[in-house]
Amino acid sequence: MEADKDDTQQILKEHSPDEFIKDEQNKGLIDEITKKNIQLKKEIQKLETELQEATKEFQIKEDIPETKMKFLSVETPENDSQLSNISCSFQVSSKVPYEIQKGQALITFEKEEVAQNVVSMSKHHVQIKDVNLEVTAKPVPLNSGVRFQVYVEVSKMKINVTEIPDTLREDQMRDKLELSFSKSRNGGGEVDRVDYDRQSGSAVITFVEIGVADKILKKKEYPLYINQTCHRVTVSPYTEIHLKKYQIFSGTSKRTVLLTGMEGIQMDEEIVEDLINIHFQRAKNGGGEVDVVKCSLGQPHIAYFEE
């Protein structure tokens, strides 16, 4: 069989040597491309894994507290261009968690100098019922937190349109949207631009005049007629959100002190917190006005620090 195979290859070489060489070259090229593809897929997978890990590390989830805003005055704009957008900005600072281990307590003083004095004294003897307990005061090292500014702009000239049916070619749908949103009887007006995304079934409509977007947004839906069929598309404000001045910070709490050495105490935590509070309220013990005390005698607790 091996001899027959060699004879066959020899016959192929004799009858079409150029084609045989070309086939061999193509085969080698295909093998090389296949190897490169496998290598590239491995590199892509590795980079995607690293990207996911980096994304998880810098993901932020914060519940922004409700803030009451006070209306002060009305400004008269110098020209219509100042009415084209509504903008606002606010700063967000994340809370930094700290785990209080069993036998530890955190005490926060009203003044920084009191906390620093308690730390500098290091050893303190606190009377816990019949026990004169020695505790050690240490600074509280905090994990990294983040701080950034959020800028939000709401356009008075543009609107978002979603739930657009995929029934026309892209250029036809763009023309249909422009025609539909320019009809004044439906609250529309002259359209300056249509940015249509067929894949997501959405579009951004930009109007020429201020006020048209506001009229359309009052109804939340808008009629879109295609081939004598009325489709109800959803309209919503067009907003742009920017994150600026993103900062990662870490450090040591200036007013809070970590107390250790209470592992052997078996009492109600609130009673121990009151006794610690009383001890460190006294100036003769190196203390001062106490803001809050939190101790852990059983399960660890999580305390949150704000900037």
UniProtKB/Swiss-Prot annotation:
Site of covalent link Glycyl lysine isopeptide (Lys-Gly) (interchain with G-Cter in ubiquitin): K22
Effect in UniProt of substituting K56R: No change in TRIM21-mediated ubiquitination
Region (Disordered): 1-24
Tissues where the protein occurs: Expressed in adult spleen, liver, and kidney. Expressed in fetal thymus, liver, placenta, spleen, lung, and kidney but not brain. Expressed in macrophages.
GO biological process: cell surface receptor signaling pathway via JAK-STAT; innate immune response; macrophage activation involved in immune response; negative regulation of cell population proliferation; negative regulation of innate immune response; negative regulation of interferon-alpha production; negative regulation of interferon-beta production; negative regulation of non-canonical NF-kappaB signal transduction
An annotated Gene Ontology molecular function: identical protein binding
Domain (NID) ranges: 103-192, 201-292
Record function comment: Acts as a signaling pathway regulator involved in innate immune system response. In response to interleukin 2/IL2 and interferon IFN-gamma/IFNG, interacts with signal transducer and activator of transcription/STAT which activate the transcription of downstream genes involved in a multitude of signals for development and homeostasis. Enhances the recruitment of CBP/p300 coactivators to STAT1 and STAT5, resulting in increased STAT1- and STAT5-dependent transcription.
Name recorded for this polypeptide: N-myc-interactor
Species, as recorded: Homo sapiens
